[in-house]
Design a protein with these regions (language model features):
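The feature marks the mature, well-folded catalytic cores of soluble enzymes
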Residues: 1-284
Length: 284
């Protein structure tokens, strides 16, 4: 059996930086460590951090009455008001937001201040998108994630529009949705804020999926970028399997397979990728 491992598989820069930040803080700090939401969308990493005493919170209300310590902002970023609320409660802040996401916050804040209506191309319930929304005027912010939503979008003709994207959104889908909005004739500025690593990962996954008999996509179930990888690979290779760890993979399905491709989301640690690759190789 021939195994093709995507070079781009595994931790991206932003995720690696965020995870390393939490581990360093956990090692050096004598006070409680909290992360605002799971630091990344990977259950194994979050569980390991919990063993080291790192607690996950999902709102500033959860900090009330808790021992003072450090709150680490997750890689996906948060709304502007969250920073103020954490400080007001007397907690220290360590910001592990991905620099590419921080750039979107700055852009959205700037264009919102200049009177633009902000369109975020992405999944409305994704924490990164929820965070981005918190840096612009809520009354002048829309989230579009489907063609149907793009078709239904309407705005007064004199309004200027600034379009940004969730960093992990499907690049081809982004272009499609932008085109639909653009056809409405608004004065639009488009800022492609999809991370380069996301584009490269998706392009490589698509190429490999076209060449193999089976494709394995590794990542957390809540990971948006892994879900996008699965969709892209499944479109090119019917035998595509979405797993979190080797335990989720039925190796018997690969018995008559000559070529297997492996890729992984940006929140998947190398040890999990290596374990999958090793088990597939040893089995056949």
């Amino acid at each position: 059996m021939n195994i093709i491992l995507a070079k781009s598989a595994g931790f991206c820069f932003g995720v690696k930086r965020a995870v390393e930040t939490v581990y360093k803080e956990a090692e050096k700090n004598q006070t409680p460590i909290y992360t605002f939401g799971p630091i990344i969308h990977n259950e194994e990493v979050v569980a390991d951090l919990e063993k080291k005493g790192v607690q996950v919170i999902h709102s500033t209300d959860e900090l009330k009455g808790r021992p003072k310590g450090t709150v680490i902002i997750r890689s996906h970023g948060v709304e502007r008001k969250i920073y103020d609320e954490i400080k007001a409660l007397g907690f220290e802040i360590v910001d592990a937001t991905c620099p590419f996401v921080l750039k979107i916050h700055r852009l959205v804040e700037q264009y919102s201040r200049e009177g633009y209506h902000i369109i975020i191309i992405g999944n409305e319930t994704h924490p990164e998108v929820e965070g981005i929304k918190g840096w612009s005027d809520p009354a002048e912010t829309s989230v579009i994630g489907t063609c149907e939503e793009a078709e239904k979008f309407t705005l007064s003709s004199e309004k200027k529009v600034c379009i940004v994207s969730q960093t992990t959104f499907n690049y081809n889908k982004f272009q499609e949705l932008v085109e639909i909005v653009n056809e409405k004739g608004y004065d639009i500025i488009v800022l492609n804020t999809i991370c380069n690593a996301t584009e490269e990962r998706q392009t490589e996954a698509e190429r490999i999926a076209k060449e193999v008999d089976a494709m394995i996509v590794i990542g957390g179930r809540a990971s948006s970028n892994t879900q996008k990888l699965f969709e892209i690979c499944k479109n090119e290779c019917e035998n595509t399997y979405y797993i979190q760890t080797i335990k989720d993979l039925d190796l018997t399905r690969l018995k008559s397979t000559d070529n297997v491709g492996i890729t992984a989301g940006a929140s998947t640690p190398n040890n999990i990728i290596e374990e999958v690759q090793k088990n597939v190789r040893n089995e056949f």
